């Protein structure tokens, strides 16, 4: 097994990049560049070796690679150069026609351990698509009228899906009394009634919101370290909070937004339940334990607030970018 550490090359390639689709394209191209270089260093003849990928069917659909699908986002294993290699017979993808639940069925047939089969999926581009980047404010911080709640539209955007098409809109954050039944009913009503929003969040810690400011930033080691610390807290907490294994995946997202302060950032928890990942529902976890987790995350230097993503798929994709 040969492992190549390419993090410095990726940080350099992504320096100053903010747009989600551009980030994904750069990551896919860099992946191929490094693969070819390392193969050459190992004296591997490209005419005798194939590139193996763990591509699954949703990757192809969301990249617009099926007959009737529009592109939602480019997966790193579906950049144009990869498509050319597929046509040339240079790539092998043994599970490309399977959904994620079917991949797990194959894993069980092979006798793989449950801990390996049931672990949360992790995106090919890594935390790069969970670390949102902004140079300037993207839209305005403004209030929406939502009976029973304080509702603020945040000056940042995330990727979503409507039908087979991509959306790129704002999240709306709610503050008020927590009740899962109310939020379950309210969230889709809010996204369906506004062309400005494609996600709904609920405040966990750091509120009430009085001001929001953008903390300009792209992908840096420091920001990724902050996100890794938060993600570790979340994954460890889920061992206790989600003993029933309701959560299929829980991305932890870093937003370049400072709540009631300057120069800080915010964390979003995105636990979802799904079978095939083409659709998903946000997971309704024990709220008291989520609030306790939120307070622990606030102890991370530079984190000003914690939100809980209460958006289904559609209209919100599982990953924010």
Q: Can you say where each PLM-predicted feature lies in the sequence?
A:
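ATP/NTP-dependent adenylation/nucleotidyl-transfer catalytic domains that generate, transfer
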Residues: 1-321
């Amino acid at each position: 097994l040969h492992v190549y550490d390419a993090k410095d090359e990726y940080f350099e390639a992504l320096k100053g990049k903010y747009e989600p689709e551009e980030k994904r394209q750069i990551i896919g191209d860099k992946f191929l560049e490094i693969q070819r270089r390392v193969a050459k260093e190992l004296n591997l003849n490209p005419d005798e070796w194939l590139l193996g990928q763990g591509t699954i069917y949703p990757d192809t659909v969301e990249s617009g690679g099926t007959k009737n699908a529009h592109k939602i986002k480019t997966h790193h294993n579906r950049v144009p150069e990869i498509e050319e290699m597929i046509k040339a017979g240079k790539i092998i993808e043994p599970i490309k026609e399977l959904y994620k639940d079917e991949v797990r069925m194959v894993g069980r047939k092979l006798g793989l351990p449950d801990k390996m089969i049931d672990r949360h999926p992790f995106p090919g581009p890594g935390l790069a698509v969970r670390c949102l980047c902004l140079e300037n404010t993207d839209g305005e911080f403004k209030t929406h009228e939502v009976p029973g709640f304080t509702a603020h539209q945040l000056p940042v955007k995330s990727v979503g899906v409507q039908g087979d098409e991509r959306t790129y809109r704002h999240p709306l954050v709610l503050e008020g009394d927590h009740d899962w039944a109310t939020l379950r009913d309210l969230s889709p009503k809010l996204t369906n009634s506004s062309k400005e929003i494609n996600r709904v969040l609920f405040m966990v810690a750091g509120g009430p919101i009085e001001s929001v400011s953008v903390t300009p930033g792209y992908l840096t080691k420091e920001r990724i370290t902050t996100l890794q610390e938060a993600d570790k807290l979340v994954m460890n907490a889920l061992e206790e909070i989600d003993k029933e294994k309701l959560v299929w995946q829980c991305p932890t997202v870093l937003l370049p937004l400072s709540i009631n302060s300057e120069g800080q950032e915010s964390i979003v928890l995105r636990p979802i339940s799904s079978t095939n990942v083409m659709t998903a529902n946000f997971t309704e976890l024990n709220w008291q334990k989520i609030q306790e987790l939120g307070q622990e995350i606030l102890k991370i230097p530079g984190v000003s607030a914690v939100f809980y993503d209460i958006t289904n798929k559609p209209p919100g994709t599982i990953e924010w970018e």
